Structures are given as C-alpha cells and as structure tokens.
C-alpha cells in the first residue's frame, strides 16, 4: 500500500491474510514508497499500526521498495540488454513527476531526461486465469508501453511490484474488482 490505509486496502489485506492462512501460505507486507508525495513516515507507520491492530500479522520482514532501488536498476539494465525495454524522450508534463526522494538512488541509466519503458509484446493474446472470474483474455495491441524508470532514475510501481513478486515467489494476487472494470487493461492485469 501507499498513502493512508483506506477500507478497500483493509479489505484486500484481510482477504490476502485469510487466503494465506487457509492455504498454509505466507502474508507479506510490502510498502510501495517510491512515490514520495504519498509515502511519508506518517503514512507508513499508520499502515503498519492499523494492520497490527486488526491482527493481520505479516510473515516477513517488511519490504520497503525504496531500499531496493539498486536491485531494480539492475533489472532495468537486464531488460534493456534483452531489448525488452527502451529509452523514450518525453515532455516534462507527461506522467513523469519529479520526486524529492530523500535517499540515494542509482541513476546510471539516465540519458538526458529519458524515461525507460517496458516493450510490450504485441503478437499473442494475454491470458490470465483468475480464481474468481475464470479465464480473462486481453488483446496485447491495447496495451501501451509503461514507464518502468522515471527520467530522474526512480523506478515506478509497474517495475518494482513485478520484480518483488518474482523475488518473493508470490503465487497469488488479490486485487479489487475495480481493476476488472478499469478502462485501462494495464490496470486490470497489473
């Protein structure tokens, strides 16, 4: 989560915690704190406190994404080397807000204000097997190439969450139904 924990976040945490307990799994707490406008210490502390007060104990040491920037940059480099990502010069007013992160991050990939985008494949239908909704298919042509590294060298949620899911060997994601009705297929499948 990011920002204030709201009832939808509590519901999703509860469902995730219950699912993990029922299936002898693990409930992980990961704080997406790459967006500093919504990632203050007050927000982080309130999320952790609220989940603890509700008895939703996590099974891991809390993962703070801001502490893994170097690892994310390594993954972006791998994607660039495999031609699965590319540099893109964007206008300043596009969704590449500047951030005032009070931490040191690795900006070795910056090329004169370029962002780095993930290169989506466009040939094969994207099929997802959802435990609630069944099989969901997406036409890859409606997906845009998402920014995975901002021009200031800060990785985006689109990258960090996928890398962490792989590293943490996440097998199930529990998301709100809003993502299935979103006009953006990226939101529905992320």
Segments (PLM) and residue ranges:
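Active-site neighborhoods of enzyme catalytic cores
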Residues: 40-150
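A very general structural signal that marks isolated residues within well-ordered alpha-helical segments
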Residues: 22, 124, 171, 187-188
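Secondary-structure boundary/capping residues
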Residues: 25, 56-59, 188-190
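Single conserved hydrophobic/aromatic residue that forms the stacking wall/gate
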Residues: 180-190
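Short, intrinsically disordered low-complexity segments
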Residues: 10, 29, 96, 107, ...
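N-terminal catalytic cores of NTP/NDP-binding nucleotidyl/phosphoryl-transfer enzymes
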Residues: 1-48, 143-179
């Amino acid at each position: 989560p990011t920002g204030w924990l709201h009832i939808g976040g509590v519901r999703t945490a509860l469902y995730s915690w219950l699912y993990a307990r029922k299936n002898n799994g693990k409930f992980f707490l990961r704080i997406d704190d790459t967006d500093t406008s919504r990632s203050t210490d007050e927000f982080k502390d309130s999320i952790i406190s609220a989940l603890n007060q509700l008895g939703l104990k996590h099974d891991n040491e809390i993962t703070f994404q801001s502490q893994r920037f170097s690892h994310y940059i390594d993954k972006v480099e791998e994607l660039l080397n495999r031609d699965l990502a590319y540099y893109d010069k964007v206008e300043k007013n596009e969704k590449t807000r500047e951030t005032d992160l009070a931490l040191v991050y690795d900006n070795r990939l910056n090329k004169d204000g370029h962002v780095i985008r993930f290169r989506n494949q466009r040939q094969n239908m994207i099929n997802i097997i959802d435990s609630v909704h069944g099989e969901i298919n997406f036409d890859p042509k409606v997906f845009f190439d998402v920014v995975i590294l901002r021009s200031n060298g800060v990785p985006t949620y689109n990258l960090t969450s996928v890398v962490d899911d792989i590293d943490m060997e996440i097998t199930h994601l529990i998301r709100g139904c809003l993502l299935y009705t979103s006009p953006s297929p990226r939101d529905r499948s992320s």
